[in-house]
Amino acid sequence: MSQEWKEYAKRVLDEWEPKTKLGMMVKEGQITDIHEIFRRGYQIKEPEIIDVLLPEVNARENQEVLDIALTVRMTDSGRRVRFRVLAAVGNRDGYVGLGIGHGKEVGIAIRKAINYAKLNIIEIKRGCGSWECRCRRPHSVPFAVEGKEGSVRVRLIPGPRGLGLVIGDVGKKILRLAGVQDVWSQTFGETRTTVNFAKAVFNALYNTNRVAISPEMIERYGIVVGRAMPTTFTLE
């Protein structure tokens, strides 16, 4: 974590008044690593938790607006126009979140979507599961995983180093934010539906956690959970 983001996290910590038990634990220094939250199975309900433990997701390059749509709803007083925004955030090293925000103005909807994405951050497994590579570096997914949303189904397949991301543009943005650099993919269904496609990719990444791994697999595929180089937040 760079000094700039350490200072940002400290400012958030000084000004923040937690409203949840997990927030208090972070504020009091009982939890100093984002991995600990997922290991204990806590639910993140305050975006400030991410601002403190994973402040680099606030960098402009670590936030992506994936889709902006205009929604119209008829009410007794006439038409009600609102914006719906789909956004993703990530640290490009094992953590990624996806969120949807609504608002009368685009800027408000974007901010809401980014905050919801922070609350929805997941920790993923990475590694080198490609038989063409076997470098044991966390540049791809360690094994094939599949995600589904609505009619859309996405399958992510380990790729060798240098391959890049063989998937649609929305999928590329999510995978890059998660720290996945090389992957093959198969897609099924109405993939032009941006929201469902994005959620299917996100669910596939989440499903890396549903596969039990052995010490032999960790060694063979170079599997890491979350950050490739875990760090603990300190104010020094």
UniProtKB/Swiss-Prot annotation:
Pfam families: Ribosomal_S5 (PF00333), Ribosomal_S5_C (PF03719)
Gene3D superfamilies, sorted: 3.30.160.20, 3.30.230.10
Keyword RNA-binding included in the entry's annotation: yes
An example molecular function term from Gene Ontology annotations: structural constituent of ribosome
Residue span(s) of domain S5 DRBM: 61-124
Domain remark from Swiss-Prot or TrEMBL: The N-terminal domain interacts with the head of the 30S subunit; the C-terminal domain interacts with the body and contacts protein S4. The interaction surface between S4 and S5 is involved in control of translational fidelity.
Family: Belongs to the universal ribosomal protein uS5 family.
Function: With S4 and S12 plays an important role in translational accuracy.
Protein's name according to its UniProt entry: Small ribosomal subunit protein uS5
Source species of the chain: Pyrococcus furiosus (strain ATCC 43587 / DSM 3638 / JCM 8422 / Vc1)
